[in-house]
Amino acid sequence: KLSQAQQLLLGTLTIGASDTVTSFFLTPFLETFHRQHPGIRLKIVSGRSAKVLSMLRSGAVDIAFASSPSEPGLSTWSCFATHSVFVAGSGYDCDFDHVYTRQEIADFPLILLERKASSRVFLEQYFLQGGITLTPEIELSSRSLLVSLAKIGLGVAGVTLEFVQDALLSGDIRLLKTDFTIPSRSVDMCTLQDVSPTAAASAFMEMVRREAR
């Protein structure tokens, strides 16, 4: 069995995360870690929260990055908060000064992520609490397509605010004002409580905790 020091020279670190989380959050950490530990082989497995958590439980990944996991048996550390909002293309036929109700938002042609996305499930549950069922016109597997299709005027997209800042700053899309605020969530760094992390996983997590604040 490799010693802790040897693991930091020769080990492998497998991380599960969505493409969006990898590009938005993880990339600088991966770059720094690779520079500090060039002998460790980094493997990134792409998947939504449910998939990477399943892989964590099966031992296929060492660390999973998932949205507000509520499953038992996990050690979690919150990396950053996320907020669900609604946007439309800057030329879309709506009143960007109007403050929309939940029902008015639901009445738009909606562009949402597919149902297996945790953010979609959370959004639907929030609207159901108000007695409103969301029936999107378009369902997508890609977050980037939400912005692309909203930009060309196909409808109002439900997006994560933190992931669409560039499109908002460029003016391609605009926020719709609402009289409600959807509760925030977080992207968490997750490991199994009853499994000791490898030296590589411990070093990576320590770096994230130190530098993400």
Language model segments and positions:
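Central regulatory/effector-binding core of bacterial HTH transcription factors
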Residues: 10-72, 140
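Short, well-ordered beta-strand segments
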Residues: 12-16, 64, 87, 111, ...
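A late-sequence structural motif
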Residues: 25, 174-213
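Flexible hinge/capping segments at coil-to-helix
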Residues: 74-111, 115
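Short beta-strand->loop
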Residues: 75-85, 170-183
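Secondary-structure junction motif
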Residues: 94-95, 109-130, 197-201, 205-206
